[in-house]
Amino acid sequence: MSEAESLDRIDPSKFLGGIIGSSVKVKLHNGVEYQGDLQTIDGYMNVALENGKEVIDNKVTKHYGDVFLRGNNVLYISEN
């Protein structure tokens, strides 16, 4: 692998560790999306959000103080 190729790759655990406390979007396999402040994430992709919102079809359907998402349901996590 060339040096240029290795610079383009990001270790997901470093990325996820770097966005703790940031506003994130978590999409689940069933299409439901949660938005909130990332409090913690573990090696199984279990996620805890604070000030969470449930979003279905681009509409906020519920507000939560804390949201806990099981990792096997998570499709992706992105920083807002």
UniProtKB/Swiss-Prot annotation:
Database matches in SMART domains: Sm (SM00651)
Protein's name according to its UniProt entry: U6 snRNA-associated Sm-like protein LSm6
MF-aspect GO terms: RNA binding
GO cellular component: nucleolus; P-body; sno(s)RNA-containing ribonucleoprotein complex; spliceosomal complex; U4/U6 x U5 tri-snRNP complex; U6 snRNP
Keyword Cytoplasm listed: yes
Listed GO biological process terms: maturation of SSU-rRNA; mRNA splicing, via spliceosome; tRNA processing
Summary of the function given for this chain in its UniProt record: Component of LSm protein complexes, which are involved in RNA processing and may function in a chaperone-like manner, facilitating the efficient association of RNA processing factors with their substrates. Component of the cytoplasmic LSM1-LSM7 complex, which is thought to be involved in mRNA degradation by activating the decapping step in the 5'-to-3' mRNA decay pathway. Component of the nuclear LSM2-LSM8 complex, which is involved in splicing of nuclear mRNAs.
PROSITE patterns on file: SM
Sm domain segment(s): 11-80
Xref: SUPFAM superfamilies: Sm-like ribonucleoproteins (SSF50182)
Recorded superkingdom: Eukaryota
UniProt source species: Lodderomyces elongisporus (strain ATCC 11503 / CBS 2605 / JCM 1781 / NBRC 1676 / NRRL YB-4239)
Assembly and binders: Component of the heptameric LSM1-LSM7 complex, which consists of LSM1, LSM2, LSM3, LSM4, LSM5, LSM6 and LSM7. Component of the heptameric LSM2-LSM8 complex, which consists of LSM2, LSM3, LSM4, LSM5, LSM6, LSM7 and LSM8. The LSm subunits form a seven-membered ring structure with a doughnut shape.
